[in-house]
Amino acid sequence: MNFTHINEQGYARMVDVSSKNDSERIAIAQAIVKMQPETMGKIRDGAIKKGDVLGVAQIAGIMGAKQTSALIPMCHPLNLTSVNLEFAFDEVNASIIIEAEVKTTGKTGVEMEAITAVSVAALTIYDMSKAVDRWMEITDIKLLEKSGGKSGHLVRD
């Protein structure tokens, strides 16, 4: 069996993508932070003592996407052209739904950057809110959609 990230000597290597064609790459990922309804209200009302939770999480998610190759050893450093995060309050489930869309034009996809963006944003929400809710849960981190490259356009059912 041949592994793409292991060389002939059995050591780790970054996959050579130099022969691939550049194409527009887009990935959309999601994470959910579950919490007490009171915590969600404090976040919405700007009543968390550490400050603007979603504003800081937005910046953290963007920074996370930009730093993905520094965090995940075999990820290629990419020239991202767009990172956008959106937050939605799910009142029924006392959750904040985070979605990130990441774009580039290049030889490899941006799935890991989108997943890292929502993960770091979720961790930031947790960090800034943990003083009022120690039992928050970060769940459902997943890729929702990707396009570009040989795989074409894929959407999670």
UniProtKB/Swiss-Prot annotation:
Top-level taxonomic group: Bacteria
UniProt KW NAD keyword? no
* Coiled-coil portions: none
- Cross-referenced CDD domains, in alphabetical order? MoaC_PE (cd01420)
Could you say which EC number(s) this protein's record lists? 4.6.1.17
**Catalytically driven reaction(s):** (8S)-3',8-cyclo-7,8-dihydroguanosine 5'-triphosphate = cyclic pyranopterin phosphate + diphosphate
Q: Which residues form the active site?
A: 127
Instruction: Cite the entry's keywords alphabetically.
Output: Lyase, Molybdenum cofactor biosynthesis
Q: What does this protein do?
A: Catalyzes the conversion of (8S)-3',8-cyclo-7,8-dihydroguanosine 5'-triphosphate to cyclic pyranopterin monophosphate (cPMP).
According to its UniProt record, which protein family does this protein belong to?
A: Belongs to the MoaC family.
User: What is annotated about its quaternary structure and interactions?
Assistant: Homohexamer; trimer of dimers.
Query: By what name is this protein known?
Result: Cyclic pyranopterin monophosphate synthase
Q: Which organism is it from?
A: Syntrophomonas wolfei subsp. wolfei (strain DSM 2245B / Goettingen)
